[in-house]
Amino acid sequence: MTPCRRGEGRVADQIAPEGVYSKSGARLLDRTGERRLPVGFDGFETVAARLVFVDKSILVADVLESGQAVTLFCRPRRFGKTLAMTMLKAFFELPPDGVSRVSLFEGLEVWDACDGRYRVEQGVRPVVFFTFNEVKKADWALAYENITVAMSWF
């Protein structure tokens, strides 16, 4: 893919009726108008539909344009890794229930970037999602056992 300029297609500074607030290139979304923060939520579908969040969807474009076979996301605890991964899953995944996830991304930066060129990538790939969120144990032996059990599901 030929990269486009980051920020191309961004909404000008405004408050849009669909709950997209844009200022100086950053987007804050609150589609319900309830101003509820996503404390304790890390699933993108829930957060995007019901809570306030910062639009980091351009990560999709970054992944597509990187050309890398593998991308490692390293961040400290509580920095939104799982939210970012569930966003990527929701964007790329062939919906197992057959219900389109397009509405989650309409109005987000990735949807508008580069004249909508990333839209064709939405919902067209099989995705394997694995998280270590539930593998928190006091010692290595218990953690290893939980990892083995979680991976045996695949």
Predicted regions: what is each one?
Residues D55, A90-F154:
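P-loop NTPase motor core
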